[in-house]
Amino acid sequence: MNMDEEASLESYFDQTIAGSSDYIFEGDLGLQGSTSQLQDSSFLSSLASQEKDLTEDLDLSFLPDELSTQDEPSQVEKESKNEDSGIYTDCPQKESTQADIDTSNSAQNTSQFNLPMTPMTPMTPMTPVAESSGIIPQLQNIVSTVNLACPLDLKSIALQARNAEYNPKRFAAVIMRIREPRTTALIFSSGKMVCTGAKSEEQSRLAARKYARVVQKLGFPAKFLDFKIQNMVGSCDVCFPIRLEGLVLTHQQFSSYEPELFPGLIYRMVKPRIVLLIFVSGKVVLTGAKERSEIYEAFENIYPILKGFRKQ
């Protein structure tokens, strides 16, 4: 490098440093040297060599091959070579040197938190899951209620509607039936209606809407308000005979068994609040649920108890 090139280089550094108010090396790097010492190219070369040593000490084996930079020259080495050959990029010297400092700090942090990689393996649950019965109770009947929100003339409905009967001496409601879904409705003069016989929640709602539509066609301003499932009945078979006498003696506070009056044992579960009818043959009927999940939960609770009283 001749004298003219060195002079132009020194002039370039002077202009760059003088034009930036936050270009302070001493505060950023903890150096005690003067500004003239920073302008010396040999001092910048020694700084680059120190950063190179820090980078070479890093263990980058955890990175993929395409991201590993151990076999490639670092950015500091490239800039050092460019400075020695008198070649400079269009970026200001401040941004280039600040990027070098950030790279060095990032490399040091990576070295501190570098942990060996281990293969991922599925973890076994700490608490074993209780054995499932494998039996799913089937819904047999759903009872729902709805408010038609208008007074009704039951005699007029019974005379005009098909499949409807009304005997006020026996029961103060119109009994109406439809085939699809196969259900029965009890329609009261207050506008309240009870729908029973559906096998699912969707069928119960559909049937209730059909009954409300029939009442509308008969000239009443019927609405469809406050539909609610009031009771669900499910049943299943455990496929083994049960000693009901032993069961009632062990669970006296929850169960009652009087074979002279009713052949099944009545078991009143507290949580969920379900009533179970248990028969010697292994048939079980569950009633009193508002949601089908309560039926499933109640059966899973009673199944281990029934296995304990299985007839040999």
Curated annotation (Swiss-Prot):
Residue stretches of biased makeup (Polar residues): 94-115
Stretches assigned to coiled coil: none
Region (Disordered): 65-115
Cellular component annotations (GO), alphabetically ordered: nucleus
Record flagged with keyword Chloroplast: no
Keywords: Developmental protein, DNA-binding, Nucleus, Transcription, Transcription regulation
Cellular localization per UniProt: Nucleus
GO BP annotations listed: DNA-templated transcription initiation; embryo development ending in birth or egg hatching; embryonic pattern specification; hemopoiesis
Tissue specificity comment: In adults, expressed in the gonads, with expression much higher in the ovary than the testis (at protein level). Shows a small amount of expression in other adult organs, including the brain and kidney. Embryonic expression is mostly ubiquitous except in early gastrula embryos where expression is asymmetric.
Molecular function GO labels: DNA binding; RNA polymerase II general transcription initiation factor activity
Protein's UniProt keywords contain Transcription: yes
Biased composition range(s): Basic and acidic residues: 75-84
Domain of life assignment: Eukaryota
The family this protein is said to belong to: Belongs to the TBP family.
Reported function: TATA box-binding transcription factor. Members of the TBP family are differentially required to regulate transcription and development during early embryogenesis. Commits mesoderm to the hematopoietic lineage during hemopoiesis, acting via mespa. Binds to the mespa promoter.
Name listed for the protein in its UniProt record: TATA box-binding protein-like 2
Organism: Danio rerio (Zebrafish)
